[in-house]
Amino acid sequence: MAYDSAATRRRILTAAIAEFAAHGVAGARVDRIAENAQANKRAIYLYFGDKRALFAAVLEQQLSHIAETVPIDGDDLPGYAQRLVDYHTAHPETLRLLMWEALELGDSEVPAEAARTRHYQDKVDAVRAAEAGDDPQALVLFTLAIASYGFAMPQLRRMVLGTDYSPERLRDSIASAVRALGTK
């Protein structure tokens, strides 16, 4: 059977997502990634370079996935927020990776910062074009924050909302809050 480098690369990325989401960059171990990917460490270094470069590749993949799966609709920010809630429910690892990035890099430049900044500016432009709210930049930031905070801090969500606050109710409450923010 011929070696499938694309399949190996995918397995490495999948294993790296789980490893980095659980342990961050500093705590992640290339040995565990290789074992879980059924690959050797040499393949990781060959395809991705060092551990930080692998983390950057993981983030790029995850952020591309959320951007493709949940495009912004400047005319329907509450619906966009609900779709973000759905995404974070199905893919909690994405927020965990972003939180690890924030913890480990702080306010330093992040991988592919220029491209990521352009991506968020496109969101701001979509909100501005829809004439939603007085401050499109703040509205995008607040929408992203409201839609993700309860997933980034599940313990706080539980303490404030209790255990009987249904996911549907949370989703609807987030949409209502975003709707109120966008009201001129």
Set out the residue ranges of the language-model regions.
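Amphipathic alpha-helical linker/stalk segments
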Residues: 22, 56-83, 120-126
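C-terminal peripheral helix-coil segments that are non-catalytic and often amphipathic
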Residues: 86, 90, 121-130, 150-184
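Amphipathic alpha-helical segments used for helix-helix packing
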Residues: 88-114, 153-161
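Amphipathic alpha-helical segments that line or abut small-molecule/effector binding pockets
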Residues: 14, 74-103, 137-144, 172-179
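Helix-turn-helix
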Residues: 11, 15-53, 57
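N-terminal intrinsically disordered/low-complexity leader segments
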Residues: 1-7
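Amphipathic alpha-helical packing segments from all-alpha helical-bundle domains
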Residues: 67, 71, 106-141, 168, ...
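Hydrophobic/aromatic residues within well-ordered alpha-helical segments
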Residues: 51, 58, 62, 91, ...
